[in-house]
Amino acid sequence: MHILIIGNGVAGTTAARTIRKLSNHRITVVSSESEYFFSRTALMYIYMGHLTFEQTKPYEDWFWKKNRIDLVHDHVIGINTDQKHIILQSGQKLDYDKLILATGSRPRKFGWKGQDLRGVQGLYSLQDLQMMIAQTNHIKRAVIVGGGLIGVETAEMLYSRKIPTTFLVREARYWNTVLPDEESAIITDHIREHPSIDLRLNTELREILDDGTGAVRGIITSSGEEIPCEFVALTVGVEPNTDIVQTTNIATQRGILVNEFFEAVDTPDVYAIGDCAEMRFANGSTPNRVEPLWYAAKAHGESVARNICQNRQAYNRGVFFNSAKFFDIEYQTYGTVQAKRNANEDTLVWYDTKNKRLLRIVFENDGSRKVLGFNVLGIRYRQNVCSAWIERGASLEEVLKNLRAANFDPEFAPQYESFLIAEYNRKIAQNLV
């Protein structure tokens, strides 16, 4: 059996490696972005001079041949699901028995005037990084539009090269559609501590201005202010990259529609995983879901490999988790922690704004006080420990008594659990020690 994978990001590469572990099937991975798999999360460190591209490749180049995974560096221009083959830009045709689409995502645009000018771009691919390196050389000012995780990474990249940057964020606090107020305030203040970054809250982009040669010369904000710049980073999120299937019978909505086995809807022997996949659940009561996360993409790759090589088993995401970095503040989240709590939820939080540290536990506000989620800033907690507590419905009191077990390095790292226990005793009027 020949398994053909389009896309060599973490989803596609994980699928290929897991299939090889489970079988002797022929595997081909096609990518137009790069010849070899690299760590996308490390692209920013190439720009900042901390790493070379070679250092972002987790595997030596000989690894793929040794493991009988064929790599094709080419662009797919057509898919024929009836005859079960793809066509490459080089003219080559590749037949398949199973096709896995792992085409990732692309930066979102909202139809702004001037969004296609030279010097205006998103940041997702290796080509985006190369373009940013070329277009930010010797510029006087940059503008970032959008306050998500890619936005703050871009701000750190530009800051490392001492490029004055105006950072436009629509919300009243940084990422406050995701972070509760205390976390959002800590991150907002931390961004503002960097002198060359001008953070503008409650501010949106209205228009990008042309210098007359097709390049950007500035932007106009929602308040009518004109800000001169030679580079604009559009970091208002990503969307599934489905261009490759638009002329096929493969169904799409936001992403490529798949069931809980990652099988494309109504298209036999085609699968989609990672950022490009939109899961439709058979029960009909769960909304369709796109999971544009590194951790999810890795899990998708492992799951689809097992479904092809072993018994079909529905994907189970398990307890949600994610991690990020806001300049030098590490962030981890496990379970359910929303910007605004539901009526059945309460929270216990301790924070130190001076040293930029925070611990938050969200729990049910009934008698059980079952723990639902954790947010951690500036402290490292173990994902497996926190997830296990959430999965088995551990109570707030049980978690607090054993909280040190979650600390990533309890022997040498500073301990903050006692502060959260003191907050519990104050709030719940107990004497937990």
Residues of each region from the PLM?
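Glycine-rich Rossmann-fold phosphate-binding loop(s) that bind the pyrophosphate
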Residues: G7-V10, Y124, G146-I150
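Cysteine/selenocysteine-centered motifs that mediate thiol-based redox chemistry or coordinate metal-sulfur cofactors
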Residues: L396-V433
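FAD-binding core/adjacent interface of flavoenzyme oxidoreductases
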Residues: M1-L4, E60-V143, N202, I220-E226, ...
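FAD-site-proximal beta/loop scaffold in flavoenzymes
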Residues: D116-H138, G212-A215, I220, E225-S303, ...
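Mid-to-C-terminal Rossmann-like scaffold of FAD/NAD(P)H-dependent oxidoreductases
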Residues: M1-H2, N8, C276-R380, N384
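A Rossmann-like FAD-binding core segment of flavoenzymes
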Residues: H25-R26, D70-I87, L94, R161-E260, ...
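A short, polar/charged loop-to-alpha-helix boundary motif
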Residues: I379-E397
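Beta1-alpha1 glycine-rich phosphate/pyrophosphate-binding loop at the start
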Residues: M1-I69, M157-L179, V385
